[in-house]
Amino acid sequence: MKVRASVKKLCRNCKIIRRDGVVRVICSAEPRHKQRQG
């Protein structure tokens, strides 16, 4: 899980979602693409 000021999709499988006011990226194909904004 990367914590970044700005989260971006890194591949076409990445999805940007918002959980409890926190913007996150989840990726089914590449778990290393997981990010959260903070």
UniProtKB/Swiss-Prot annotation:
N-terminal signal peptide? none
Q: Which PROSITE patterns match?
A: RIBOSOMAL_L36
Ordered alphabetically, the record's keywords are:
Ribonucleoprotein, Ribosomal protein
Q: Which InterPro entries match?
A: Ribosomal_bL36, Ribosomal_bL36_sp
GO cellular component terms given for this protein: cytoplasm; ribonucleoprotein complex; ribosome
Whether Acetylation counts among this entry's keywords is: no
Q: Name one GO biological process term.
A: translation
Q: GO MF annotations for this entry? A: structural constituent of ribosome
Task: Supply the HAMAP family for this chain.
Answer: Ribosomal_bL36
Give the protein family: Belongs to the bacterial ribosomal protein bL36 family.
**Name this protein carries in UniProt:** Large ribosomal subunit protein bL36
